[in-house]
């Protein structure tokens, strides 16, 4: 039936005879299974091939869509296979390169810090970008992880205010009963509080080899364990108190967070980058630091 329908991509030459670097489609909806997380996710897919032949008006988007629509499991092998098929399906266009981008949110169940049998779901945005260019396969993984950061400078300034308040109230006493100290702290220990904020670590990694798939859960866990203050889901007061303690024990400038991630990623990946953004509560702008593998 299609043979009887006009196809201007074949019958009409382009007015401007020139090759194109990438042509394709964006935001294709696709349910996929993430092997290493044992989870089905709603994925947005971008697909591209190059168009080297200037005599060809356009690519075959329906062929690309058909190939993507049959992709059900996301792992290195399946992604590499579909990239090869994308190139093979466009030999009449002279295609030598293909690129594919997967975007999805990975949902992980997270336990409360202290409370038993209390948990909630946390979303982690993930991007997988892979390509074959001149027969060379490349793949990288990008994740966003939210955490809390408390400013060390603000903490020091807050401590000074509390210290000065304590001295002002008790400077005339040589011996201070412990009950009086407890009562004072109960009322005035928050004369000043350090500013803290939700923060985002964006990590991009490439594995040492492509024989093994990235385990997203392991990577996320290692990043959160390194930063120490991941944002929480379900909490009770005991968990909120434990979270406050974690923040107090892990005061961080953006530089501190970036260096923590550098130490972690240097040990695990060949190529990587880490960007940390602290969405300042003190300022209307953000603080940012970036570290990249050498």
Curated annotation (Swiss-Prot):
It holds the Pfam family GCHY-1. It is an enzyme of class 3 (hydrolase). Its EC number is 3.5.4.16. GO terms for biological process: tetrahydrofolate biosynthetic process. Keywords: Hydrolase. It comes from the Bacteria. Pathway: Cofactor biosynthesis; 7,8-dihydroneopterin triphosphate biosynthesis; 7,8-dihydroneopterin triphosphate from GTP: step 1/1. It catalyses: GTP + H2O = 7,8-dihydroneopterin 3'-triphosphate + formate + H(+). The keyword Protein biosynthesis does not apply. NCBIfam families: PRK13674.1-1. Belongs to the GTP cyclohydrolase IV family. HAMAP family: GTP_cyclohydrol_B. This is GTP cyclohydrolase FolE2. It comes from Acinetobacter baylyi (strain ATCC 33305 / BD413 / ADP1). The gene is folE2.
């Amino acid at each position: 039936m299609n043979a009887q329908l006009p196809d201007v991509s074949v019958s009409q030459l382009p007015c401007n005879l020139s090759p194109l670097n990438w042509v394709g489609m964006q935001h294709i909806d696709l349910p996929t299974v993430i092997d290493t997380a044992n989870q089905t996710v709603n994925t947005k897919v971008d697909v591209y091939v190059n168009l080297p032949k200037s005599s060809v008006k356009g690519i075959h988007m329906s062929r690309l869509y058909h190939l993507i629509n049959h992709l059900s499991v996301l792992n290195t092998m399946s992604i590499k296979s579909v990239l090869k098929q994308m190139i093979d399906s466009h030999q009449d266009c002279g295609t030598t390169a293909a690129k594919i981008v997967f975007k999805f949110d990975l949902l992980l169940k997270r336990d409360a810090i202290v409370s038993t049998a209390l948990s909630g779901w946390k979303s982690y945005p993930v991007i997988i970008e892979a390509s074959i260019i001149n027969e060379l396969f490349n793949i990288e993984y990008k994740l966003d992880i939210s955490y809390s950061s408390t400013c060390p400078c603000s903490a020091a300034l807050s401590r000074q205010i509390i210290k000065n308040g304590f001295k002002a109230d008790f400077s005339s006493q040589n011996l201070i009963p412990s009950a009086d100290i407890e009562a004072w702290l109960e009322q005035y220990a928050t004369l000043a509080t350090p500013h803290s904020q939700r923060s985002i670590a964006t990590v991009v990694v490439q594995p040492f080899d492509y024989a093994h798939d990235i385990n997203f859960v392991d990577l996320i866990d290692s990043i959160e364990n390194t930063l120490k203050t991941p944002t929480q889901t379900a909490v009770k007061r005991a968990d909120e108190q434990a979270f406050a303690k974690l923040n107090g024990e892990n005061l961080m400038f953006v530089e501190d967070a970036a260096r923590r991630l550098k130490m972690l990623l240097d040990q695990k990946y060949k190529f990587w980058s880490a960007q940390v953004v602290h969405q300042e509560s003190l300022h209307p702008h953000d603080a940012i630091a970036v570290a990249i593998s050498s």
